Amino acid sequence: MVSEAKMSNIDFTLFIDAHSWWKCKGFNDKVVPSYVDDDAMDHTCPEDVTDLRIVQNGKYAVASAEQSFLQLDKEGKLEDGSWMAVTPCFRDEMVLDDIHFNIFLKMELFRSATSKKNAEKISHEIAKDAISMFTLLGIPRGVLSLVKTPIGYDVYCDDMEIGSYGARKTLTGKWYAYGTGLAEPRTSIAIQKYRGNE
């Protein structure tokens, strides 16, 4: 269903700020593929999602750079560590409105872990760090919340999810923590909502 939605702008300066923040938290830049194999897509796709995928030369446009990291790991091209990358994210949204889009831009975080427990601990720490970053970007702390989910944590600004964090195994069986470093235009939408209201 498509509603009359106001198209929001992407503020690239927020990515510059987020990059500095996550760099200070130990994350390093990684060049990643924007198209991956179907198993990398399937690995992170929720069971209840019907996925209409964009295909080019037998590869699929990513829904998040998490899949890009999985592809690199599968190919033996991802060293253990803490990585960040920005990709367009293609989604098959059931409802398109002011906060739901078929395409948006997202910085994804990926940190290697030693076990499931370690990966879950790391994802929780990343989610808490994200709340601090969102506050520095201009979202009042009082409207931000950390919500436990079946697979990890979501960060909400009021009733809008602005970050998702969790733990999984790669296709090769290694534990890792993942999360949203920054997503646009949702972060801009949240900032604009409260600008001048503090």
What are the functions of these language-model segments?
Residues 1-198:
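TRNA-recognition modules of translation machinery and tRNA-sensing kinases, especially anticodon-binding
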